[in-house]
Amino acid sequence: MGLPKSFVSMSLLFFSTLLILSLAFNAKNLTQRTNDEVKAMYESWLIKYGKSYNSLGEWERRFEIFKETLRFIDEHNADTNRSYKVGLNQFADLTDEEFRSTYLGFTSGSNKTKVSNQYEPRVGQVLPSYVDWRSAGAVVDIKSQGECGGCWAFSAIATVEGINKIVTGVLISLSEQELIDCGRTQNTRGCNVGYITDGFQFIINNGGINTEENYPYTAQDGECNVDLQNEKYVTIDTYENVPYNNEWALQTAVTYQPVSVALDAAGDAFKHYSSGIFIGPCGTAIDHAVTIVGYGTEGGIDYWIVKNSWDTTWGEEGYMRILRNVGGAGTCGIATMPSYPVKYNNQNHPKSYSSLINPPAFSMSNDGPVGVDDGQRYSA
């Protein structure tokens, strides 16, 4: 016997009322924040991030931007159904244009012909369900690019640091500044804009790269120090691109090493991301270079672990988890142009994550990595 229509209508009205009240309750901070309260938050934020302005007019202009940022954050976080949170960070007083021009320094279009089939999906291939190169000691601590659009250099260096650790067993923090000062090309111009693969090519042509300790970061363009450029502590042999728009191939690559990627980071949600699994909104007009250092699944949601170069004050101590396995270009275009450096060992192939952390989960055949049933299986 069905329920009376009057009962169904009353139930719908009841739950609709509860939903409205819940949203109103969660968003109460939007209406309860007084101007004095927001001003106090702003002044605390200024102290935390060491911000100061030359005039009262500039202070007030930045305060208005801060208020809009805070409103966006409150509105976003009031929705308890969201998979991620946003929060106040060092970008809270910047306009969109200032943020883009200062922190987003990646440009696409270089060396698209060097696509390798090494990590093409193969029928029956099984991948680990979880990879985190941080736990294998192959990831240097979070760095900060500062007010320099050198994200391309940070991404390139992070993957070189990673493959060097995987092949040699030694983790060395390498010099982004050397790439910015000495690695300029027609398309790669230091703090202004750059290609990740131009960073790899510089290291190959130069015969190696110096350490961060010897050639420290300054967050600005400088003259190339030739003496320091000639000190070469880490080398790579070549670089390759993962098949484009193929998240399974990208996942396969990440089981063997951290991978450089680019994505669309221009939106407010990405800019102010603080925790959780980021699902957008974002497009696929890639403008920022980062590094994938792992992947996993939480609550049935697959994600990539992304290392950024915006200090530990952004995201999850400098990292982001971003939605994985959406197909095509991936979330925010993350699968559009993945690339990685190659450093040969006696097997001409890096050790897999599983072989370094757990008993080996892969064996090698003439066709590439072959897995055992401990994770995700690919089928055509």
Curated annotation (Swiss-Prot):
Residues 1-24 form the signal peptide. The active site is at C151, H288, N308. Residues 25-126 form a propeptide. GO terms for molecular function: cysteine-type endopeptidase activity. InterPro entries: Papain-like_cys_pep_sf, Pept_asp_AS, Pept_cys_AS, Pept_his_AS, Peptidase_C1A, Peptidase_C1A_C, Peptidase_C1A_papain-like, Prot_inhib_I29. Its EC number is 3.4.22.14. Pfam families: Inhibitor_I29, Peptidase_C1. It catalyses: Specificity close to that of papain. Coiled coil: none annotated. Keywords: Allergen, Disulfide bond, Hydrolase, Protease, Signal, Thiol protease, Zymogen. Repressed by the active-site-directed cysteine protease inhibitor E64 (L-trans-epoxysuccinyl-leucylamide-(4-guanido)-butane) produced by Aspergillus japonicus. Belongs to the peptidase C1 family. This is Actinidain. The gene is ACT1A.
